Regions:
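Gly/Gly-Pro- and Ser/Thr-rich, intrinsically disordered tail segments characteristic of DNA damage-repair
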Residues: 1-201
Length: 201
């Protein structure tokens, strides 16, 4: 039976990555993108995360607690331009792409292992390299037999070399270890209801 496999391609700290693409000196620095002087933090570099800056932190609080961090006002036209570059790169390799946000897309890789004569993990690596080289944006890729099971490992991919795959024989274990709050599509109210009924994973 044909193996069905979906990739979730997720741009890393997308707004910050766009700022670093146009201003390379920002790479390796603690950088945050904020929604204006009276707004809040909407994107953080890895260094800013390590420093302790939280997503959604009000600008006045972030500047007070983390004065050494570089703060950039959001530039949505810039991010849309880079989003188009990323999606164009992805579509040059994978015909079936579903954009779900400015920095995220599902790609159906089913049977493309035979087209490119490689395994799916290597194909994901090729996608990452192409996007990084052409669009100058780093991405992480989760691989799984469905959209849900591609979404779950995409966060793990950020800490495991950029790619993480869930294989069919590990699905049960992965779901058992996944908190309900981490499952895409289950909102806070449903999560509370399930917890009330003793369902946590």
């Amino acid at each position: 039976m044909k193996e069905h496999i979906i990739a979730l391609v997720d741009c890393d700290s997308f707004f910050v990555s766009c700022e670093q693409a146009v201003e390379p000196s920002l790479r390796g620095q603690p950088v945050c993108v904020v929604t204006g002087d009276n707004g809040c933090v909407v994107s953080r570099s890895r260094e800013a995360k390590k420093a302790g800056v939280k997503m959604g932190m009000p600008m006045f609080m972030a500047r007070r607690e983390f004065p050494s961090v570089i703060y950039k006002n959001a530039r949505h036209e810039l991010y849309c331009r880079y989003s188009r570059r990323v999606m164009t790169c992805l579509r040059e390799i994978v015909p079936d792409v579903e954009e779900v946000s400015v920095d995220e897309a599902y790609a159906d890789l089913t049977s493309l292992d035979r087209v490119y004569r490689t395994d799916y993990t290597s194909l994901a690596a090729r996608i990452r390299e192409t996007i990084r080289r052409t669009a100058d944006i780093p991405v992480s890729i989760g691989l799984g037999p469905s959209k849900l099971l591609a979404k779950l490992p995409s966060d793990k991919a950020k800490n495991t070399g950029g790619i993480f795959r869930i294989f069919p024989d590990s699905i049960e274990n992965v779901l058992r270890e996944t908190d309900i709050d981490d499952v895409s599509g289950i909102g806070r109210s449903h999560s509370k209801l399930m917890a009330y009924n003793g369902v946590f994973t």
